[in-house]
Amino acid sequence: MSSESGKPIAKPIRKPGYTNPALKALGIPALRLPSRNWMIFWSVLTVSIGGIAYDKYKQRQILSHATDLVKPLAEESMEVDKVPRKITVFIAPPPNDYLESSLKVWRRYVKPVLYYAGLDYELVQEDRQGIIRTNVANRIRELRKEILASTDGQPVKEPNQTVAKPSGSSTSKISSLLPFNKIIQDPAEEDDSFDPEIGKKFKENFDWRNVIGIFYTMPKPKHIISEDALTKDPILSGGVICLGRGAYKEYIAGIHEGLLGPIEKTEKTGSTEPKMTGVVEANQIESKVSESGATELVDAEKETALEEAKVQDDLKVDEENSSEDSQKFLKPFISSDQYPDLQIASELQTPNGEFIRNPNTNIPLLINQPLLVIPIPNLIGFTTIPRRIHRFYQKRFYVEDVCSSVVNCVRQTRIRPFDIAKDIDLAKDEEKDWPQNWVKQGKEKNSEWTQELVCDPRITKHMFVYEKPPKEEPESDI
């Protein structure tokens, strides 16, 4: 073995990094570039965080610019006996997902623009298919009932009777709003005497202006007029926003069902009364006990009475819940195949073929108010992760489209008639994100969302839509 082979191998000399006598005196080592692996790690981390920060920054800038465009509308003066223009908003959840996914778009990008514009809005949201369609159709059917009742000389509705308010102290004014005029000392007596109908009537007649505000000591205006009722052109009144392709489909179906369908469902439906299984079991228990001794029969009768009372209470709760659900959701009165064979409700049309305004409020019907459809992109599944990441970093472009459309809805700058050829496919790109298994099950169950959207030209010729603003230069308005 040679002497050279026994010598240790010398390590490569490290290059001295940048240093400074002052830093060296403080004990700070020389500054050197990190290794290759650390460079890769910090580069990827910086690009990832920087992309997120830039996208969030642009979203805030777009939303701020949109709100600045509509703020002058809210600064206009308005008399105390008028209410601002009202936008009706329909929100549906994405397929196989929660409603919160759609509400995020509403809270972050739509609601702020309407708020800073000083507009009123009515929010209609659904947690199951058919609620929006039922809501739209019921509005039209209720109006048809009122018009037919008024033409027949029958009273349409009982006016809300306000509670007489005695003059005097503030306690008398507040007590006049209470549903009961007596003070109940016993809690058990209070539970027994509570009437849900009185509570509902109290809620309908309750007015905060009787308790707080300037009208607490000053006379209230006799008539409240909406700005929508003062507009001569129905196109410039109100407005409808549908968040999601599903909400848009149900809105169109509800318009057709309300105008073409009957006021009441003609076909007979099965009884919706709950089964009396609990009572049958109680009767069986009673029959078995009757065969035993007399002493056991007395105890069994008490138990049976308690069980029957419990069953009756459960049945009342089930009936109340079923009635509330039935009011929110009804099966379609007509199908899309019946549209050509049906006639538009004549009580809602004028001699020249146009639709009348609501006789109670003088506000145009929903069919005459322009429509805006906002898609809700929502990808679900493990295989869609790359596309979801790409959309996450490009969300500012979606925010720009939404904000520009809502600003156009507020300012009413671009409105055109409804065109079946292209407007029937509004937000149709959203269907590409729907899970394939969900679509397959929907077709098997004859879901409303998976069916082809059908429109009647007699209906759509009275409809208008907010046209999507064209892409503009970055320095110009949205």
From Swiss-Prot:
Cellular localization per UniProt: Mitochondrion inner membrane
Regions that span the bilayer: 33-49
Region Disordered, annotated ranges: 152-171
Domain of life, source organism: Eukaryota
Family the entry assigns: Belongs to the TIM54 family.
Task performed by this protein: Essential component of the TIM22 complex, a complex that mediates the import and insertion of multi-pass transmembrane proteins into the mitochondrial inner membrane. The TIM22 complex forms a twin-pore translocase that uses the membrane potential as external driving force. Its precise function within the TIM22 complex is unclear.
Oligomer status and interactors: Component of the TIM22 complex, whose core is composed of TIM18, TIM22 and TIM54, associated with the peripheral proteins MRS5/TIM12 and the 70 kDa heterohexamer composed of TIM9 and TIM10 (or TIM8 and TIM13).
Protein name per Swiss-Prot or TrEMBL: Mitochondrial import inner membrane translocase subunit TIM54
